[in-house]
Curated annotation (Swiss-Prot):
The gene is rplV. GO terms for cellular component: cytosolic large ribosomal subunit. InterPro entries: Ribosomal_uL22, Ribosomal_uL22_bac/chlpt-type, Ribosomal_uL22_bac/org-type, Ribosomal_uL22_CS, Ribosomal_uL22_sf. Keywords: Ribonucleoprotein, Ribosomal protein, RNA-binding, rRNA-binding. GO terms for biological process: translation. This is Large ribosomal subunit protein uL22. Part of the 50S ribosomal subunit. It comes from the Bacteria. Belongs to the universal ribosomal protein uL22 family. It holds the Pfam family Ribosomal_L22.
């Protein structure tokens, strides 16, 4: 059995999120939470929140034991890109892209 949680339209670029996501893939849930707690990246608290949600889904909906859970799959996909204008010289403007992410965490019980 596996449980899934998705964080949609998170205001961090997917490239930055993937750096942290790669650290917890395949790890035990408690170990993954410890890694996220001590990783000094802006994406760490957001990923920890999605991981906690996946653990809660597993324990509440599927009655799985949280001690036996591990991070089966985790990935970050590109979401919408908000576009903003930055005024420049002579009436021109440059485009600022504010990228967002969808973060998906799948936890499963180890056999």
């Amino acid at each position: 059995m596996e449980a899934k949680a998705i964080g949609k339209t998170i205001r961090i670029a997917p490239r930055k999120v993937r750096l942290v996501v790669d650290l917890i893939r395949g790890k035990n849930v408690k170990e993954a939470q410890a890694i996220l707690m001590f990783t000094p990246r802006g994406a760490s608290p957001v990923i920890a929140k999605v991981l906690d949600s996946a653990i809660a889904n597993a324990t509440h909906n599927l009655n799985l034991n949280p001690e036996n859970l591990f991070v089966k799959e985790v990935w970050a996909n590109e979401s919408i890109t908000m576009k903003r204008m930055l005024p420049r010289a002579k009436g021109s403007g440059h485009l600022i892209r504010k990228r967002t992410s969808h973060i998906t965490v799948v936890v499963a019980e180890r056999e």
